[in-house]
Amino acid sequence: SGMILVIISFILFIKVINFKNRDHLSEIKFLIIILCFTITLKPFYLINIPLILLLLLYDKTRNVFLNLFFSKTFWYCLSLIFFIIIYTFINSGCLFFPLVFTCFENLPWSVDFKSINDVKIWFELWSKAGASPNFVVENKSFYVSDLNCISNLIDQYFFNKVSDFLLGLLLLLIILAIVFKNSFGKRVKKDVSFIYLYILLVCFLLEWFFNHPTLRYGGYHLVFLSIFIPFSIYLNQLNIDFKTFERKAVILIFVT
Protein backbone atom coordinates (compact mmCIF):
# COMPACT_ATOMS: atom_id res chain seq x y z
CA SER A 1 0.00 0.00 0.00
CA GLY A 2 1.20 3.50 -0.85
CA MET A 3 0.05 4.80 2.54
CA ILE A 4 2.31 2.33 4.37
CA LEU A 5 5.25 3.46 2.22
CA VAL A 6 4.51 7.10 3.08
CA ILE A 7 4.49 6.23 6.80
CA ILE A 8 7.87 4.51 6.36
CA SER A 9 9.14 7.62 4.54
CA PHE A 10 8.13 9.88 7.43
CA ILE A 11 9.79 7.56 9.96
CA LEU A 12 12.96 7.42 7.87
CA PHE A 13 12.97 11.22 7.55
CA ILE A 14 12.79 11.64 11.34
CA LYS A 15 15.63 9.15 11.71
CA VAL A 16 17.80 10.95 9.16
CA ILE A 17 17.44 14.43 10.68
CA ASN A 18 17.88 13.32 14.30
CA PHE A 19 20.74 10.80 14.26
CA LYS A 20 24.05 12.59 14.66
CA ASN A 21 27.55 11.67 13.49
CA ARG A 22 26.30 9.39 10.73
CA ASP A 23 26.63 9.24 6.98
CA HIS A 24 23.06 9.77 5.79
CA LEU A 25 23.75 9.17 2.10
CA SER A 26 22.36 5.63 1.95
CA GLU A 27 19.33 6.54 4.10
CA ILE A 28 18.45 9.57 1.95
CA LYS A 29 18.83 7.43 -1.16
CA PHE A 30 16.46 4.90 0.36
CA LEU A 31 13.99 7.69 1.21
CA ILE A 32 14.04 8.94 -2.39
CA ILE A 33 13.58 5.42 -3.76
CA ILE A 34 10.60 4.74 -1.46
CA LEU A 35 8.85 7.97 -2.44
CA CYS A 36 9.60 7.36 -6.11
CA PHE A 37 8.12 3.86 -5.94
CA THR A 38 5.08 5.24 -4.11
CA ILE A 39 4.47 7.71 -6.93
CA THR A 40 4.52 4.86 -9.46
CA LEU A 41 1.64 3.25 -7.56
CA LYS A 42 -0.52 6.39 -7.79
CA PRO A 43 0.56 9.74 -9.29
CA PHE A 44 -1.51 11.31 -6.49
CA TYR A 45 1.44 10.64 -4.17
CA LEU A 46 3.45 13.32 -6.00
CA ILE A 47 2.11 15.55 -3.24
CA ASN A 48 4.76 13.99 -0.96
CA ILE A 49 7.68 15.42 -2.98
CA PRO A 50 8.07 18.35 -0.49
CA LEU A 51 9.10 15.75 2.10
CA ILE A 52 12.39 15.31 0.23
CA LEU A 53 12.84 19.06 -0.21
CA LEU A 54 12.63 19.49 3.58
CA LEU A 55 16.11 17.98 3.73
CA LEU A 56 17.41 21.30 2.42
CA LEU A 57 16.37 22.99 5.68
CA TYR A 58 18.84 20.98 7.78
CA ASP A 59 22.57 21.67 7.70
CA LYS A 60 23.62 18.04 8.13
CA THR A 61 21.47 16.77 5.27
CA ARG A 62 21.58 19.71 2.84
CA ASN A 63 24.97 18.93 1.28
CA VAL A 64 24.28 15.21 1.15
CA PHE A 65 20.98 15.82 -0.61
CA LEU A 66 22.47 18.30 -3.09
CA ASN A 67 25.22 15.82 -3.96
CA LEU A 68 22.55 13.28 -4.84
CA PHE A 69 21.51 15.45 -7.80
CA PHE A 70 24.50 13.96 -9.61
CA SER A 71 23.88 10.37 -8.53
CA LYS A 72 22.38 7.53 -10.57
CA THR A 73 19.72 7.00 -7.90
CA PHE A 74 18.31 10.51 -8.34
CA TRP A 75 18.25 10.38 -12.13
CA TYR A 76 16.76 6.89 -12.23
CA CYS A 77 13.95 8.03 -9.93
CA LEU A 78 13.44 11.25 -11.88
CA SER A 79 13.28 9.29 -15.14
CA LEU A 80 10.71 6.91 -13.67
CA ILE A 81 8.49 9.79 -12.49
CA PHE A 82 8.89 11.44 -15.91
CA PHE A 83 7.79 8.18 -17.57
CA ILE A 84 4.65 8.05 -15.40
CA ILE A 85 3.78 11.64 -16.35
CA ILE A 86 4.37 10.93 -20.06
CA TYR A 87 2.24 7.78 -19.86
CA THR A 88 -0.63 9.80 -18.36
CA PHE A 89 -0.14 12.49 -21.00
CA ILE A 90 -0.26 10.02 -23.89
CA ASN A 91 -3.47 8.46 -22.58
CA SER A 92 -5.39 11.62 -21.70
CA GLY A 93 -3.57 14.73 -22.87
CA CYS A 94 -3.06 15.70 -19.22
CA LEU A 95 0.15 15.79 -17.24
CA PHE A 96 -1.80 15.08 -14.05
CA PHE A 97 -5.24 13.68 -14.74
CA PRO A 98 -7.88 14.96 -13.92
CA LEU A 99 -6.42 18.40 -13.11
CA VAL A 100 -7.79 20.52 -15.97
CA PHE A 101 -5.05 23.17 -15.78
CA THR A 102 -2.45 20.48 -16.65
CA CYS A 103 -4.36 19.32 -19.73
CA PHE A 104 -3.99 20.22 -23.42
CA GLU A 105 -7.32 20.18 -25.27
CA ASN A 106 -5.97 20.88 -28.77
CA LEU A 107 -4.12 17.56 -29.14
CA PRO A 108 -5.67 14.84 -31.35
CA TRP A 109 -5.89 12.33 -28.49
CA SER A 110 -6.87 14.76 -25.73
CA VAL A 111 -9.97 14.22 -23.64
CA ASP A 112 -12.23 17.27 -23.77
CA PHE A 113 -12.14 19.61 -20.79
CA LYS A 114 -15.78 19.02 -19.88
CA SER A 115 -15.25 15.26 -19.52
CA ILE A 116 -12.10 15.81 -17.48
CA ASN A 117 -13.86 18.27 -15.20
CA ASP A 118 -16.80 15.86 -14.81
CA VAL A 119 -14.37 13.13 -13.71
CA LYS A 120 -12.71 15.53 -11.25
CA ILE A 121 -16.07 16.52 -9.77
CA TRP A 122 -17.11 12.87 -9.53
CA PHE A 123 -13.92 11.88 -7.69
CA GLU A 124 -14.38 14.79 -5.30
CA LEU A 125 -18.09 14.04 -4.92
CA TRP A 126 -17.38 10.42 -3.99
CA SER A 127 -14.67 11.38 -1.51
CA LYS A 128 -16.99 13.92 0.17
CA ALA A 129 -19.85 11.42 0.69
CA GLY A 130 -21.91 13.04 -2.05
CA ALA A 131 -22.25 9.83 -4.02
CA SER A 132 -22.59 6.12 -3.33
CA PRO A 133 -23.80 3.08 -5.32
CA ASN A 134 -27.41 4.04 -4.54
CA PHE A 135 -27.25 7.80 -3.89
CA VAL A 136 -26.04 10.97 -5.66
CA VAL A 137 -26.64 14.57 -4.59
CA GLU A 138 -28.54 16.75 -7.04
CA ASN A 139 -26.31 19.83 -7.36
CA LYS A 140 -22.87 18.26 -7.69
CA SER A 141 -20.83 21.39 -8.38
CA PHE A 142 -22.38 23.26 -5.45
CA TYR A 143 -21.90 20.31 -3.10
CA VAL A 144 -18.14 19.96 -3.72
CA SER A 145 -17.43 23.71 -3.58
CA ASP A 146 -16.30 25.45 -0.39
CA LEU A 147 -17.50 23.52 2.69
CA ASN A 148 -21.05 22.75 1.56
CA CYS A 149 -20.46 19.04 2.10
CA ILE A 150 -19.60 19.25 5.81
CA SER A 151 -22.98 18.40 7.36
CA ASN A 152 -23.62 15.46 5.04
CA LEU A 153 -20.01 14.28 5.32
CA ILE A 154 -20.24 14.17 9.11
CA ASP A 155 -23.58 12.39 9.02
CA GLN A 156 -22.81 9.88 6.27
CA TYR A 157 -19.11 9.23 6.77
CA PHE A 158 -17.63 10.48 10.03
CA PHE A 159 -19.92 8.59 12.42
CA ASN A 160 -19.25 5.18 10.99
CA LYS A 161 -15.79 5.03 9.42
CA VAL A 162 -13.72 7.94 10.74
CA SER A 163 -15.03 7.55 14.29
CA ASP A 164 -14.22 3.81 14.28
CA PHE A 165 -10.71 4.55 13.00
CA LEU A 166 -10.13 7.21 15.67
CA LEU A 167 -11.40 4.88 18.39
CA GLY A 168 -8.99 2.22 17.14
CA LEU A 169 -6.09 4.68 17.35
CA LEU A 170 -7.21 5.76 20.83
CA LEU A 171 -7.27 2.13 21.96
CA LEU A 172 -3.76 1.63 20.60
CA LEU A 173 -2.56 4.74 22.46
CA ILE A 174 -4.09 3.42 25.69
CA ILE A 175 -2.40 0.03 25.22
CA LEU A 176 0.97 1.71 24.60
CA ALA A 177 0.47 3.98 27.62
CA ILE A 178 -0.19 0.90 29.79
CA VAL A 179 2.87 -0.88 28.39
CA PHE A 180 5.17 2.06 29.16
CA LYS A 181 3.45 3.38 32.30
CA ASN A 182 6.44 2.46 34.51
CA SER A 183 8.66 4.72 32.41
CA PHE A 184 6.48 7.81 32.80
CA GLY A 185 8.27 10.39 34.91
CA LYS A 186 11.70 8.95 34.06
CA ARG A 187 12.52 11.44 31.36
CA VAL A 188 15.82 11.86 29.56
CA LYS A 189 16.67 15.08 27.74
CA LYS A 190 16.76 14.33 24.01
CA ASP A 191 16.52 16.95 21.31
CA VAL A 192 14.27 15.72 18.53
CA SER A 193 13.76 17.90 15.49
CA PHE A 194 10.44 17.43 13.76
CA ILE A 195 8.71 20.83 13.70
CA TYR A 196 9.18 21.41 9.94
CA LEU A 197 7.99 17.89 9.25
CA TYR A 198 4.90 18.40 11.38
CA ILE A 199 4.09 21.71 9.65
CA LEU A 200 4.28 19.89 6.32
CA LEU A 201 2.06 17.14 7.72
CA VAL A 202 -0.54 19.72 8.79
CA CYS A 203 -0.46 21.17 5.25
CA PHE A 204 -1.06 17.68 3.85
CA LEU A 205 -3.96 17.23 6.27
CA LEU A 206 -5.56 20.51 5.20
CA GLU A 207 -5.19 19.62 1.52
CA TRP A 208 -6.76 16.22 2.22
CA PHE A 209 -9.63 17.69 4.25
CA PHE A 210 -10.59 20.35 1.71
CA ASN A 211 -10.22 18.25 -1.44
CA HIS A 212 -10.74 14.54 -0.74
CA PRO A 213 -11.63 13.92 2.94
CA THR A 214 -11.98 10.17 2.69
CA LEU A 215 -9.65 7.89 4.64
CA ARG A 216 -8.91 5.69 1.64
CA TYR A 217 -7.79 8.76 -0.37
CA GLY A 218 -4.79 9.52 1.83
CA GLY A 219 -6.51 9.97 5.17
CA TYR A 220 -5.41 6.86 7.03
CA HIS A 221 -1.70 7.61 7.12
CA LEU A 222 -2.10 11.38 7.63
CA VAL A 223 -4.37 11.00 10.66
CA PHE A 224 -2.17 8.21 12.05
CA LEU A 225 1.04 10.23 11.65
CA SER A 226 -0.45 13.43 13.08
CA ILE A 227 -1.32 11.55 16.28
CA PHE A 228 1.58 9.14 16.64
CA ILE A 229 4.51 11.39 15.73
CA PRO A 230 4.04 13.56 18.87
CA PHE A 231 3.34 10.45 20.97
CA SER A 232 6.47 8.74 19.63
CA ILE A 233 8.55 11.85 20.34
CA TYR A 234 7.24 11.78 23.91
CA LEU A 235 8.13 8.08 24.27
CA ASN A 236 11.60 8.90 22.97
CA GLN A 237 12.08 11.20 25.98
CA LEU A 238 11.45 8.35 28.43
CA ASN A 239 14.15 6.25 30.02
CA ILE A 240 12.96 2.90 28.67
CA ASP A 241 14.51 -0.43 29.55
CA PHE A 242 14.76 -1.94 26.07
CA LYS A 243 15.11 -5.53 27.31
CA THR A 244 11.79 -5.17 29.08
CA PHE A 245 10.46 -3.35 26.03
CA GLU A 246 11.29 -6.30 23.75
CA ARG A 247 9.29 -8.68 25.92
CA LYS A 248 6.36 -6.27 26.07
CA ALA A 249 6.55 -5.72 22.31
CA VAL A 250 6.22 -9.46 21.65
CA ILE A 251 3.22 -9.65 23.99
CA LEU A 252 1.69 -6.57 22.34
CA ILE A 253 2.07 -8.08 18.87
CA PHE A 254 0.31 -11.28 19.94
CA VAL A 255 -2.49 -9.31 21.65
CA THR A 256 -3.16 -7.13 18.61
What are the roles of these predicted feature ranges?
Residues 15-37, 75:
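Short hydrophobic alpha-helices at membrane interfaces in multi-pass membrane enzymes
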Residues 24-28, 73, 186-200, 217, ...:
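Membrane-interfacial loop-to-transmembrane alpha-helix junctions, especially the N-terminal start
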Residues 33-34, 64-89, 247-255:
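Hydrophobic alpha-helical membrane-interfacial segments at the cytosolic entry of transmembrane helices
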Residues 18, 48-78, 234-236:
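Perimembrane helix-loop-helix junctions
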Residues 27-43, 47-54, 82, 93, ...:
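Membrane-interface alpha helices of multi-pass inner-membrane proteins
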Residues 142-190:
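Hydrophobic, aromatic-rich transmembrane alpha-helices
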Residues 1-10, 38-41, 47-48, 204, ...:
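Hydrophobic/aromatic-rich transmembrane helices and adjacent perimembrane loops
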Residues 58, 71-163:
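Membrane-lumen/periplasm interface segments of specific transmembrane helices
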